[in-house]
Amino acid sequence: MTETFAFQAEINQLMSLIINTFYSNKEIFLRELISNASDACDKIRYQSLTDPSVLGESPRLCIRVVPDKENKTLTVEDNGIGMTKADLVNNLGTIARSGTKAFMEALEAGGDMSMIGQFGVGFYSAYLVADRVTVTSKNNSDESYVWESSACGTFTITSTPESDMKRGTRITLHLKEDQMEYLEPRRLKELIKKHSEFIGYDIELMVEKTTEKEVTDEDEEDTKKADEDEEPKVEEVREGDEGEKKKTKKVKEVTKEYEVQNKHKPLWTRDPKDVTKEEYAAFYKAISNDWEDPRATKHFSVEGQLEFRSIMFVPKRAPFDMFEPNKKRNNIKLYVRRVFIMDNCEDLCPDWLGFVKGVVDSEDLPLNISRENLQQNKILKVIRKNIVKKCLEMFDEVAENKEDYKQFYEQFGKNIKLGIHQDTANRKKLMEFVRFYSSESGEEMTTLKDYVTRMKAGQKSIYYITGDSKKKLESSPFIEQAKRRGLEVLFMTEPIDEYVMQQVKDFEDKKFACLTKEGVHFEESEEEKQQREEEKAACEKLCKTMKEVLGDKVEKVIVSECLSTSPCILVTSEFGWSAHMEQIMRNQALRDSSMAQYMMSKKTMELNPRHPIIKELRRRVDADENDKAVKDLVFLLFDTSLLTSGFQLEDPTGYAERINRMIKLGLSLDEEEEVVAAEATVAETAPAEVTAGTSSMEQVD
C-alpha cells in the first residue's frame, strides 16, 4: 500500500532552494550520506552493547556505495539501525528539524552549501545531484518501507514486506543528466578519500574487476568434431589422438566486487599504547603525502568539559615554501566526530607552528562550524591552546636527544624564533628551545640556559651581536673588549634574530645587551674607571674636532668601552636599528621610507684611546687642530668604521679617492705630474690618429 504525504512548508522551501540554486561544490552530498550512514551504524552498535541480539544476521557493520551506470543511479547503503515508517515520515518530510530554518537563513546570508549537514538536514543535499531519491529502510521493530520523492512538494511511503533487506537503510539517487561523473569509480574514490577516509566503519565501493581467463576455443572444437564425423570410424583410435591437446584462448572476464576505500582507520581513537611506530608512520604518510617517517609524534586526548583527540607530527624536513605568504596551509585536518570538516583551518594552529601536521577530532564542536564563525568559537580557542601546549611538550621530547634536536633545529629553528616574536603567552618557554653559536661554543650551538650557567661572577648581562655570518662576527671589533675580559658573546646570524630581540629583553632575569648599540658597560675596577676618566679627558679635544669635521654624519664622538685592538667603530642608539637590521630593511622592496628614516638614527663614533692611530691623531689635533691632513684621516676613519661596523658606505667614490691618495703618499707619487703626463699622451696621439685617418681616406679616393 502506498501513502502520499506533503512536505512540511519549511522542508519544501529548503528543497526548492537546493534544487534551484546553482552551487558548484555539489560533491558534499556523498559526505553527508556516508556521515548519516555512520550515525545509523553507531546507533545499532550502542544498542548491541546491552543487547547483542539486535545485530541479528549482520553483525559486521559497514557502508556500501554502488554506482549503476546502466540505470544511472548511485546507491549508499548501510546495515545500521534503520528507520521505522514513523521515522521516515518524521525525519524525511513532515517535521522540520530545528536546523532547517537556521540553515536557510545562513544560506540566504551567503553561507556555504557544504554546511548543510552541520544543521542536521544533510540528507537533502542528495537533491544537488539527483532529481529523484528513493529510500528503502528496515528497522528491527518494523517491516521495511520505501520512501520516494522527486522534490515536487510531496513524498510517498510504500510498505514492502517482501523486501530482502534484513536491517538498515538504502538510499538510491536517480542522477540528473549533468551529474553522471558521480558514477565513475575514480571520482567516488577521490570523494571518499577526501571527506570520509576516517569514518569508523568500512566504506565498500562496488567496482568492476577485469581478469583474463583461459578457456577452450569452442569454435575450433566444433570444427574438429565435424571433421571426425566424416572420417572412417576405424581411424578414431589412431595413435597420437590421445595426446592431442585442446586449443585454448584467453578471454577477459568482468566481475563486480566490493573494495574497501577507507583502509586507514582513525588511529586517534585508539590508545597510544596500542599503536606501533610503523602505524604512526603509515598514518602520517597518508595524511601528509610525505615519503619519510615523521621526526616526532604526539598522540593525545583531552577529556572533561571539552573532549577531543589529536595526533600531531613533526616532519623531518621543512617544505621549501614554508614561509610563502600566499601559501594555502592544510597541515591540520579538522574532524567533528570523525567526519572531515576542513583541512586548512588556520585558526586551529598559530602561524609559527605551520610545519606541524596532524588531525584533530572534536566531539564538542558544533557541526555548523564555518570559516566565518571559527574565530569566535570558544571551543576552538581551547583546542588551539591545547595543541600549542602539546607541541611544546613534543619539542621537549625531541630535545632529549641532542643529535635529533640539532637536525630538528636546522629545519625549524626559524619557526621557533617566529613563535617568540608572535606568541607572547609561550615566549618564555620558547626561549628554552632557541640555539645560537657563541664565542665559546666553537662549531656547536648553545642554549641560553647553558650560557647563563657559564656567566662570569658579577656578569649582569647576556652579551650578543647580530650579523650576516658567524665568521664575520668572530672577527668583529665589537666583541674585542668582551673577549679580552673572557666574556662569552652570542652570535645571532639570521635576519629573524633582529625581530626576536625586539620582543625579548631578558632571560632568567639577565638582561640582553647588544654590543653594536650604545650604552654597553662592563664591570670595571676602580683603577680601570679612573684610567677611563683620564682617557676621556685627554681625548676631549679630538672628539670635538672629529665631530666638527663629520658634522651630521654622526650624533657624537666618544671614548669607547668595547674596543681593544681596533681604532674606532660606529654604534647605533639603544632603541634604533642595528647595522644588520638596517641592511635587512634596505633590502625590503616595500619598506616604509618614513619609518626607515626614523629608525636609522644618527650613529655614535667610538674611539679606542689606546690605539696608535688615535694617539697620533690626538697629537696632531693638539698641535694644530687646523691640520689639513687631519680632515682626510677623519673621513677615512669614518668610512672604514662604516665597513667594519657592518654599515653601507654612503660615498664609495669618495672613499676610493681617499684610499688612492693614501696609497700615493705611501708610494711617494706626485698626483699632479701623473695627470699632466696623461694629458700630454693624449695630445701627442690625437694628431697621429687624424693623420692616419686622412691618409686612408686619400687611398680610398
Swiss-Prot record:
One of its GO terms (cellular component) is cytoplasm. It is found in: Cytoplasm. Keywords: ATP-binding, Chaperone, Cytoplasm, Nucleotide-binding, Stress response. One of its GO terms (molecular function) is unfolded protein binding. A motif (TPR repeat-binding) lies at residues 697-701. InterPro entries: HATPase_C_sf, Heat_shock_protein_90_CS, HSP90_C, Hsp90_fam, Hsp90_N, Ribosomal_Su5_D2-typ_SF. Residues 210-250 are annotated as: Disordered. Gene3D superfamilies: 3.30.230.80, 3.40.50.11260, Heat shock protein 90, C-terminal domain, Histidine kinase-like ATPase, C-terminal domain. ATP binds at N36, D78, F123, R371. Residues 228-242 have a biased composition (Acidic residues). The TPR repeat-binding motif mediates interaction with TPR repeat-containing proteins. Molecular chaperone that promotes the maturation, structural maintenance and proper regulation of specific target proteins involved for instance in cell cycle control and signal transduction. Undergoes a functional cycle that is linked to its ATPase activity. This cycle probably induces conformational changes in the client proteins, thereby causing their activation. Interacts dynamically with various co-chaperones that modulate its substrate recognition, ATPase cycle and chaperone function. PANTHER family: HEAT SHOCK PROTEIN 90 FAMILY MEMBER. NCBIfam families: PRK05218.1. Homodimer. Belongs to the heat shock protein 90 family. This is Heat shock protein 83-1. It comes from Leishmania infantum.
